[in-house]
């Protein structure tokens, strides 16, 4: 919650990001970029927040491949933020979908 509201995600000490830049993937935190090698062809990204043990991990969710883990000291609530430039974004929590929701759209 302490991240500046008008600043790119990953450009400060209160946010972490996985970004695609020119067909390469990087993780960002506090204005530092670390390339993910080799550059994966990601179709689905998994994010695991372990608040109690202080880590945020990014995964290739389709292939169950770990991409990067940040060790973090969290003192405030964490708010997920997602940005997609020109494609579709679907958020899956890993929890079962309640029966009362109409979920007719199929994932590719």
UniProtKB/Swiss-Prot annotation:
Domain of life (superkingdom): Eukaryota
EC number: 2.3.2.27
One of the protein's GO biological processes: regulation of microtubule cytoskeleton organization
Gene3D superfamilies in the record: 2.60.120.920
Keyword flag Transferase: yes
Reactions this protein catalyses: S-ubiquitinyl-[E2 ubiquitin-conjugating enzyme]-L-cysteine + [acceptor protein]-L-lysine = [E2 ubiquitin-conjugating enzyme]-L-cysteine + N(6)-ubiquitinyl-[acceptor protein]-L-lysine
InterPro entries (UniProt xref): B30.2/SPRY, B30.2/SPRY_sf, Butyrophylin_SPRY, ConA-like_dom_sf, E3_ligase_FN3/SPRY, SPRY_dom
Gene Ontology terms: cellular component: cytoplasm; microtubule
Localization terms from the record: Cytoplasm; Cytoplasm, Cytoskeleton
Keyword tags: Cytoplasm, Cytoskeleton, Metal-binding, Microtubule, Transferase, Ubl conjugation pathway
Regions that span the bilayer: none
Domain B30.2/SPRY: 1-100
Single GO term (MF): metal ion binding
Principal subcellular localisation of the protein: cytoplasm
Keyword Zinc attached: no
Protein function: Has E3 ubiquitin ligase activity towards IGBP1, promoting its monoubiquitination, which results in deprotection of the catalytic subunit of protein phosphatase PP2A, and its subsequent degradation by polyubiquitination.
Quaternary assembly: Homodimer or heterodimer with MID2. Interacts with IGBP1.
Family: Belongs to the TRIM/RBCC family.
Protein name, per record: E3 ubiquitin-protein ligase Midline-1
Gene (name only): Mid1
